[in-house]
């Protein structure tokens, strides 16, 4: 085959047929239609985009014009910060009370209100007082009739006192040197600051009556001083020896020395207690003397304890001369106490003798309206209080005031025929001591502290909240009874300091969490003059706690501690050798004194 023939054959083979040409034309038409459809859709989307942009621009312009109109011609609004609304009950999280930036003492203050109270009592010693101020005793520089809550008496700021006694009309105190300080309307109506009166006698304790002050000196002398400055100036002033040899002169004020003259060798007066008209003098050898203690009235309700002794039958000599209570001879009397018109004496064996007025049952004997006076010491029946309880009672303390009497009792558990000797629980109870407190007398103002308002209570009534208390002692690893450290009784109210475990050894050398704490103290009874210190006027028939004395400092402490208000109670500072605010080192403790319609807590020493 020639080359020309081959070329024609190849050309013929490459030439498409009619079916192939038709399919090609159809495909080209489809592609052309698809391209036209895509261009149409793109055109529509572009048109929609232009319309959207126009709408947004129009809306923005309208908003700008509105903002321009609202903001007084300014396109930019002037913003002001607004505080968020406060929640009704916001959730407060307590922060850590110990902060590295705080000192050791600041951290301890935040940890414990009790530690703060103890520290403040050392830094700022003085006197807090409250109650009736009709005689300007509680607040000498104020004309307020009552002081509802504890308030400091500025004169005593920084001072330590040996003793203090308060009547609604006059007050008396002994400073650290043993000098007598007096104030109040009953002393001088125009004097609004305490005055030092009897000096140089080294007084250690005080007792007051209707219008006189009895001061006991360190050497055992008993001085009877008029409460009134006028009487001090007008009554006979005794001769006094001077430190200059062979030189003597009259005292600056009038007073009487009523120390018994027939004391034995080495015997001296160790304690004095007084009512409105009488006083009891206890000697170091357990003897008891009684004497009249008011200037204008002689005791007539048997409170002297000497049968038949009256103003008409009194022996020759001074009206206030002491008389030995011979009925108590042979009993070693350890403590004495006086109410307004009655007397109590406790001997070393735990027996109590009572005499005087029994109109409210304050002697603990059955009430007899035909014979309300007992003029000789009589033994208080005690066994019936523990009848059938397998306990042996022993009275450990007596206190009295107004028309009330109080006793504290240690009751020891003993074996009885009813006990099962094989019961180990019974064996553990043998020898267990329970400390109880009883009250008797007038309860109409709540002084019985038993939740009742009894007019006459002749049988001693147990005070539930001050009886049968125990705590764990870490030093002895045992449970011990909580007794009363001190009981102060006023005319219608009382206060008790508990003998619970206290601690005052926290120092720079102990741990950061080591804090001091004081003793519990409670108040109860009449409150008509706000003498309980609660800030309210209702009487209390149950012992109650008070707020801390220095509430201003307590509020500041609470703000640093938790940032919120905290509720704490007053704890009284126990005896300790401490550094005071002025740098002095002294034995000091806080003491409570209930008087006639008023109360005081003071920094005591000696």
What do the PLM-derived regions correspond to, one by one?
Residues 1-88:
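N-terminal mitochondrial targeting presequence
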Residues 70-123, 127-149, 181-199, 223-256, ...:
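Short glycine/serine- and acidic-residue-enriched loop/turn motifs that recur at repeat junctions
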Residues 159, 167, 193, 201, ...:
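Loop/turn position at the start of each blade in beta-propeller repeats
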Residues 124-125, 168-169, 177-178, 210-211, ...:
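Short coil/turn segments that connect the beta-strands within blades of beta-propeller domains
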Residues 148-170, 185-211:
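Blade-loop segments of beta-propeller domains
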Residues 129, 170-173, 182, 212-215, ...:
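Conserved core positions of repeat-based scaffolds
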Residues 153-156, 195-200, 205, 261-264, ...:
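Surface loop/turn motifs at the tips and blade-to-blade linkers of beta-strand repeat domains
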């Amino acid at each position: 085959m020639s080359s020309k023939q081959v070329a024609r054959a190849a050309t013929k083979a490459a030439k498409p047929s009619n079916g192939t040409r038709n399919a090609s034309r159809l495909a080209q038409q489809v592609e052309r239609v698809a391209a036209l459809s895509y261009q149409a859709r793109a055109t529509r989307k572009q048109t929609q985009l232009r319309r959207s942009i126009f709408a947004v621009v129009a809306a923005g312009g309208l908003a700008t014009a509105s903002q321009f109109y609202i903001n007084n011609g300014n396109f930019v609004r002037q913003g002001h910060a607004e505080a968020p609304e406060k929640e009704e009950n916001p959730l407060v999280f307590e922060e850590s009370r110990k902060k590295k930036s705080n000192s050791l003492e600041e951290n301890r203050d935040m940890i414990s209100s009790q530690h703060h109270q103890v520290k403040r009592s050392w830094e700022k010693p003085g006197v807090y007082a409250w109650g009736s101020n009709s005689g300007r005793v509680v607040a000498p520089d104020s004309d307020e009739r009552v002081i509802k809550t504890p308030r400091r008496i500025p004169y005593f700021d920084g001072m330590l006192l040996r003793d203090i006694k308060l009547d609604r009309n006059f007050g008396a105190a002994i400073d650290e040197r043993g000098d007598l300080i007096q104030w109040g309307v009953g002393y001088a109506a125009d004097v609004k600051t305490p005055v030092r009166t009897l000096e140089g006698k080294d007084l250690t304790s005080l007792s007051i009556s209707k219008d006189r002050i009895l001061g006991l000196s360190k050497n055992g002398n008993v001085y009877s001083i008029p409460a009134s400055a006028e009487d001090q100036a007008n009554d006979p002033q005794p001769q006094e020896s001077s430190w200059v040899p062979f030189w003597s002169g009259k005292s600056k004020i009038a007073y009487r020395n009523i120390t018994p003259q027939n004391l034995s060798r080495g015997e001296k007066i160790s304690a004095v207690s007084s009512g409105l008209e009488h006083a009891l003098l206890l000697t170091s050898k357990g003897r008891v003397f009684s004497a009249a203690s008011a200037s204008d009235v002689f005791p007539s309700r048997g409170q002297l304890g000497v049968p038949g002794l009256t103003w008409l039958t009194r022996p020759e000599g001074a009206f206030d001369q002491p008389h030995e209570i011979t009925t108590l001879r042979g009993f070693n009397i350890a403590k004495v106490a006086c109410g307004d018109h009655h007397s109590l004496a406790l001997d070393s064996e735990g027996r109590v003798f009572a005499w005087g007025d029994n109109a409210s049952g304050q002697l603990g004997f059955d009430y007899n309206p035909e014979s309300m006076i007992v003029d000789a010491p009589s033994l208080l029946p005690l066994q019936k209080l523990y009848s059938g309880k397998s306990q042996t009672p022993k009275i450990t303390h007596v206190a009295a005031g107004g028309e009330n009497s109080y006793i504290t009792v240690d009751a020891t558990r003993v074996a009885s025929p009813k006990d099962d000797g094989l019961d180990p629980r019974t064996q553990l109870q043998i020898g267990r001591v329970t400390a109880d407190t009883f009250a008797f007398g007038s309860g109409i103002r709540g002084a019985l502290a038993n939740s009742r308002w009894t007019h006459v209570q002749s049988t001693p009534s147990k005070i539930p909240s001050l009886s049968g208390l125990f705590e764990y002692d870490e030093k002895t690893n045992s449970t011990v009874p909580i007794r009363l450290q001190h009981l102060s009784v006023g005319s219608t109210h009382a206060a008790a300091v508990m003998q619970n475990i206290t601690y005052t050894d926290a120092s720079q050398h102990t741990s950061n969490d080591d804090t001091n704490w004081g003793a519990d103290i409670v108040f109860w009874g009449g409150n008509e003059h706000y003498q309980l210190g609660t800030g309210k006027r209702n009487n209390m028939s149950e012992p109650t706690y008070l707020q801390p004395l220095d509430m201003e400092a307590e509020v500041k402490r609470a703000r640093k501690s938790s940032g919120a208000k905290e509720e704490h109670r007053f704890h009284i500072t126990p005896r300790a050798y401490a550094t005071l605010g002025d740098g002095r080192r002294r034995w000091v403790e806080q003491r409570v004194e209930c008087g006639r319609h008023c109360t005081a807590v003071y920094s005591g020493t000696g």
